[in-house]
Amino acid sequence: MLQRAHKHSSPFASTPPHTRQKEIGEIMGRHLAVELLSSGFFEGIDMLVPVPLHKKKEKLRGYNQSEWIARGVSVITLIPVFTSGMVREKNTETQTHKSAFERWENVDGIFRVTIPEYFSGKHILIIDDVLTTGATTVACATAFDKVEDIRISILTLAVAE
């Protein structure tokens, strides 16, 4: 299901990720959840799974913006955030200046589910900050291919045009 709460430019668009404060992600996650709550979008979702950063990138940045967006969504929906079931195995280059094809190549096979049995029989909501080509979120969802009886939905804060 594709549902747009509002069509606005992202408040993050003009600032590089490393200069953003994590609290902004949580606030935006709360606002997003409030906008979607009455639509039934969150019904049946068992857990929120933020798109993971590579541990080196997260250490350098100090936080994972998708995790903080997920935390904000969780405050409103009371759906738990689960951050330890998937890892980003490759520290890829930034996607900012890549073509659509290069973005898909850059993220191919970079995620691994570490606890597949935990997700079996669950409906998870993968949360990312910005959807551009969909390459990252599809790569993330594809990592769950071997998990039995899983349902996956995706939520992003912003869609780049």
Name the predicted role of every residue range:
Residues 1-47, 54-71, 75-78, 82-123, ...:
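Active-site-facing substrate-recognition patch
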